[in-house]
Every structure is written in structure tokens, then in C-alpha cells.
Amino acid sequence: RHARLMSARPEKGPGQFKREVNRAGQTVFVDPGHVEGTLRQGFELYLSLETAFARAVYMMFLVSEVHPFADGNGRIARVMANAELVAAGEERILVPTVYRANYLSALKALSQAQDPGPIVRVLDFAQRWVAATPWMDLEGTRVALERNHAFMDANEAENAGIRLRLP
């Protein structure tokens, strides 16, 4: 999936695990020499999860936490999560711009404080938001997304006390 997702960026090594340690701010991700083993062990736990939503949340976290590629890790994490949901006939999860800070801080809560509650709540809300949003016609969708603040910058929305709303 990563190879297909990143095919237009051959310099990023589509489908190849990273060769150098990657960072996001102060966070240092899994050492390149441990990526494959970490993913294999993570996959063993994944196999024990019973629901598509649990597998989606876990897969999103696993890929985000390991950061196995030089680029495209967040995108592939969301692709992998949605593949779980689609395979089970469930609604996808989308993280609109206004909700990005919520998503990232929920990932941090799990990564740094071993607290899965925030990411489960954030992704559950995102999935319910997708289910409630009318996607059938472009103009109707655009209006609904604007009305529910989906396009707002997360920081501007936070400063104004504005949140993503269910349609």
C-alpha cells in the first residue's frame, strides 16, 4: 500500500522501510534496524483484536508509532485503518483539518502516557462524523463540511472555541 501511495515520489523509497531514524519534534521513532521486528510483534497483537474498529485504531497507532517509512507514515496509517473498516463493511474514518490537533494529541496520549481512551474517543467521533456527513453531491458535501467547521485551521478553531460538529 505504501508503494502505491507514494509512487509519485520515488525519492521517498515507496514501499521500502526507512534507512535512517526519523523524528517529529522531540519524538524519535523506532530505529530502522528494529522496524520489521517491531511490526511483526505488533501484528501478533493485531491478530487477537476482535472488532474492525479495534483493529483500525490499533493499526493506525502501530504505523504512527513505528513510523516505518521515510515519508507518508500518517497517510499510510490512515489507509491501513480504513482498510480494516472497509473490509468489515464499516464506515471509514476521516480526520478533517479542524480535528487534526485532537487526533495528534490523542496519539500522543497513547504513545507517551499509555492511555488509549483519547484515541478511541477521537476516532469514534471521526467515524460517526463521516457516517453523518452527506457525501452524495459535491455542493451539498461542501456546504455541510463548511457548516460543521471541517475546513477550519485547528489552531484558529481552538482559539475561537470552535469544534468539529456532527451534521
Located regions from the model:
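FIC/Doc superfamily catalytic core
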Residues: R1-P167
